[in-house]
């Protein structure tokens, strides 16, 4: 199997350690590709809309995004990690996710995404990790992923692993290993189930794209939906099973 990891920081702190513990269960049976932000996607999205209007290859940062996109599409499991900064994911993670706006269901979602699983790992000193995880989940779910595991925690005492109490270290280790075992025992030869919320999103966007495509057959998103057969009877979660 293939695992693609997007690290929201280059720092090797508590989040990094938790990620390493999660991956330990997979190291003998998976090809793991990791990206570190901002190094592997260093620039901000400038909102030019080229990706949505002209195609993702016209993005000024295509040299970075195309490589990562390929890894994401080839992955059976996507792991996204980020420490919590002021109740949110890192700025580098937000900048990364902005580059993939064209992959949202209202635009040109990849059918492969609808059969994938994903895991989000985040923590913080105090509160805020849940809202940070929500930042990432928002994009993953709008990419079409239904099966998303989430690990969050409030450290409270310190942000350095070695300075945490043994009790806290044991608690974090136990929880992340439990999540790892859960995802390690999945049969990745079978696509994940697409939930009703995701299907509803597709249904709503299909009506929108059908109307737009009728009035402007050359509009990129509408053409994509038509080519995929989604304006007819085909659906993204059926496409990726074929």
Predicted stretch roles:
Residues 1-109, 148, 170-242:
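N-terminal beta1-alpha1-beta2 submodule of the flavodoxin-like/Rossmannoid cofactor-binding fold
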Residues 41-44, 127-129, 158-160:
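A short beta-to-alpha transition loop/helix N-cap that caps and shapes the active-site region
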Residues 91, 129-134, 161-163:
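A short secondary-structure junction signal
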